[in-house]
Amino acid sequence: MTDQENNNNISSNPFAALFGSLADAKQFAAIQKEQLKQQSDELPASPDDSDNSVSESLDEFDYSVAEISRSFRSQQEICEQLNINHMIQRIFLITLDNSDPSLKSGNGIPSRCVYLEEMAVDLEDQDWLDMNNVEQAVFTRLLLQDPGNHLINMTSSTTLNLSADRDAGEKHIFCYLYSCFQRAKEEITKVPENLLPFAVQCRNLTVSNTRTVLLTPEIYVDQNIHEQLVDLMVEAILGGHFESVAEFLDEVIEALILDEEVRTFPEVMIPVFDILSSRIKDLELCQILLYAYLDILLYFTKQKDMAKVFVDYIQPKDPSNGQMYQKTLLGVILNISCLLKTPGVIENHGYFLNPSRSSPQEIKVQEANIHQFMARYHEKIYQMLKNLLQLSPETKHCILSWLGNCLHANAGRTKIWANQMPEIFFQMYASDAFFLNLGAALLKLCQPFCKPRSSRLLTFNPTYCALKELNDEERKIKNVHMRGLDKETCLIPAVQEPKFPQNYNLVTENLVLTEYTLYLGFHRLHDQMVKINQNLHRLQVAWRDAQQSSSPAADNLREQFERLMTVYLSTKTAMTEPQMLQNCLNLQVSMAVLLVQLAIGNEGSQLMELTFPLPDGYSSLAYVPEFFADNLGDFLIFLRRFADDILETSADSLEHVLHFITIFTGSIERMKNPHLRAKLAEVLEAVMPHMDQTPNPLVSSVFHRKRVFCNFPYASHLAEALIKVFVDIEFTGDPHQFEQKFNYRRPMYPILKYMWGTDTYRESIKDLADYASKNLEAMNPPLFLRFLNLLMNDAIFLLDEAIQYLSKIKIQQIEKDRGEWDNLTPEARREKEAGLQMFGQLARFHNIMSNETIGTLAFLTSEIKSLFVHPFLAERIISMLNYFLQHLVGPKMGALKVKDFSEFDFKPQQLVSDICTIYLNLGDEENFCATVPKDGRSYSPTLFAQTVRVLKKINKPGNMIVAFSNLAERIKSLADLQQQEEETYADACDEFLDPIMSTLMSDPVVLPSSRVTVDRSTIARHLLSDQTDPFNRSPLTMDQIRPNTELKEKIQRWLAERKQQQKEQLE
């Protein structure tokens, strides 16, 4: 029988309608033939049916209706078998059937499949796939080195189908198995119920084969299995279908964990982490691919078993070497930022190159773009850490141990030498980027309890920081993973051992880890920013000077400036991502609340209201490291300098900061370190409104801060705290205290000025002055009296130093202009230039500070008079004012006429105006005017006449000039009268003269230890600065001195006698 006849017979068979195509029916017939043949081989031939056997009829291709009807005893089984074959072909895109595509219907079979030729030969006449041979078929398919060479058409369609070719001929076996998994999933949703178990079995087969591939990758030639896994995940993430891949991998991971005979699960997965580490380290912050890799790690850190492998994998080879943490996979991730990878090297740096060629708007756009990526990046790292903390106690312990050990190994970042030796620094410690990013992620972890009224916040236990060394098991039980905090200096010294709880909560650990990370990272970067700022200013000045003098160094200076500007913009951008700043502000405000609660002895879970006087019970501050308060101050100062808008938009929370400053600035009992308390004054300057921040400030830019500052309920205590720390930093015990105190006091002057302009603060300052006036001779000099004494000391020293430096600058400028430097050797000229620059910096600093001190005295004397005109202070302030006028308006003023006053912040007009204002404020007091002529060193009627001339020249208001002229006349009259009296008393004996001032004593007192007699006003002034006997250095207070009544009476009798004699002479 011919093929045509055979086909006709089958097509006319009514059962053929059960098949999808004529080819399917023919295939069924072949199956039956095979089965019957096997049966005939096993059973003896029967003479009754041998002539009519189906086998025989099939051999002869005699497909009559009767014969096929007898063969198809189980129609359902036959259809099922064919459908299983088609399903396997659709899932795995493989086949054993290479018959003519035109004989196949194309209905339910894929257009292209890989023909498994060797397997087809082995199975001889079986050209279909079933559940018995599918596992072998898939394994055979996986071993093909180039499956694309084995593709065949399954349908008669001649249309080019590249996607079908690509899918069936997929060379990467991991991707192939995932695709099979997806196709099996689809089959499960479509096949009839009777085929569902087989579809599920095929799906499981993809998982089991993937497990085998990962366990024994070496048997698959030219297949980098782990690379394929990573690529598959990346492609799925970028393509937006990662959930499907995750479902597949979940099952593969589960299968791997159940089968660790060949390889353990970590051994299988570590190569994946190796690949991720090598790829991530070369990526930049703004590359989309980076975020795909981070999403892969996010998936892994959600998987309990993968997360365990991850936390083991990131352990550094040497846990004591801080830099080694940066080389781990987590460290590689944390090291990515817009900061320079190698400090000072801008080559290959992708951000802010040639900034001078970019407009401010372009720089702003680039900054905003980087911030968008940073926010996304920090979120990924945060989610990763959060996953590890929440997944299991084991991963939580491991990641916290990693963080604690890392911070301990990098503790040296804060050492002074670390900034001075960068080449050693970067070999020993992890990078700035590492800690900035880690800090940003940890800040996010703290946000749930970073609310000022959070009850969770008060569960923080500071004794955590006092724990000594623990072993690993103890750390796990107690939840303590930071090391070495017991060696940190705390806010106050501990007087007793703390009571340690059984364990600590995550709030405590998170706060400590975050604060220490900020201390190692943000704090150090802020210092660098300030130095970069200073260097930029210096370069700008040098560049401008070089341009003006047509120096060949100009181009080099410009290049240096350009490079440093790139560093500055990159660093500023890295530190000012808005969400990170807001999170940090939330933390620091919460820390202010927490420290205030500890300072008032609150050990409960509910907030206590702040009341004055402060209650006792603040011993827990002895376990709070200073860096908690240092971070708070440092961050707020940073915001003031580089992100002031954050302060304004968060003004409502600043009241908590004011509480903190009020309590700690003035309380040595709660914060022993005077340097840290002085820093809080700078913090106060940072958070208070600055009306002069721009030439035309918008009221709204400080409106909210002004409201908070002016309505602060503890204004009087804040003003007192500020004045107290002003006084305290005079005696810090530091060998550099003299130089330091001026820097510490710099921010205090604008604060005092702002306070004086606000009613509540001004009244509280006046109350302090009134109290001082009434207690001038108290055992301990009143606070405000000591403050005024130090203020005048500063004014005298600073302006005198400024005058000296300006005189030197004047001389050097003249020498330079005359050409005297032209003949010097290059080295000598450089020394001269450096000297001039140094004098300029010193003059500028002293001028700024003297302007502030004199200005402060000017507004204070407007309403506080009694203290200034008291003999304790009057002579000192008068001699100071006259001395300065002598240099500013007298014949000596020519020595101060440097080229450019503004370059050195020299403001002689303002100084003259302020000095005259002080005179006019106090001039109504008769004893003050009477004291002016007693200044024999500087006062003269001519000096005041010269002052009037200068006031006219600088266009001061007419009423001021008239008032000062009248005052000058009054003082001149008193001077004439005093001169006559002095002539009368010129021959006073030494017993009547003050041994220190050599002036006639008016109120002699005896010092208890040295038994020396001095004038009361003289010793009172001395004790304001030094509470010792000036003659033997014994401790001395005003309440210990005794009046020398006998000597006082002798002096008064002698004065009366002299006056009487003078009167008689005149008559």
Curated annotation (Swiss-Prot):
Catalytic activity: S-ubiquitinyl-[E2 ubiquitin-conjugating enzyme]-L-cysteine + [acceptor protein]-L-lysine = [E2 ubiquitin-conjugating enzyme]-L-cysteine + N(6)-ubiquitinyl-[acceptor protein]-L-lysine
Enzyme Commission (EC) number: 2.3.2.27
Enzyme class: transferase
Matches recorded under Pfam families: U-box, Ufd2P_core
UniProt subcellular location: Cytoplasm
Domain named U-box: residues: 987-1061
Keyword Disulfide bond carried by entry: no
Pathway membership: Protein modification; protein ubiquitination
Keyword Zinc-finger carried by entry: no
Residues the record lists as N6-acetyllysine modifications: 386
CDD domains from the UniProt entry: RING-Ubox_UBE4A (cd16657)
Transmembrane residue ranges: none
Molecular function in Gene Ontology: ubiquitin-ubiquitin ligase activity
Region (Disordered): 33-57
One Gene Ontology term, aspect cellular component: cytoplasm
Biological processes, Gene Ontology terms: ERAD pathway; protein polyubiquitination; ubiquitin-dependent protein catabolic process
Main location: cytoplasm
Stated role: Ubiquitin-protein ligase that probably functions as an E3 ligase in conjunction with specific E1 and E2 ligases. May also function as an E4 ligase mediating the assembly of polyubiquitin chains on substrates ubiquitinated by another E3 ubiquitin ligase. Mediates 'Lys-48'-linked polyubiquitination of substrates.
Entry text on domains: The U-box domain is required for the ubiquitin protein ligase activity.
Protein name per UniProt: Ubiquitin conjugation factor E4 A
UniProt organism field: Bos taurus (Bovine)
Lineage, opening ranks: Eukaryota, Metazoa, Chordata, Craniata, Vertebrata
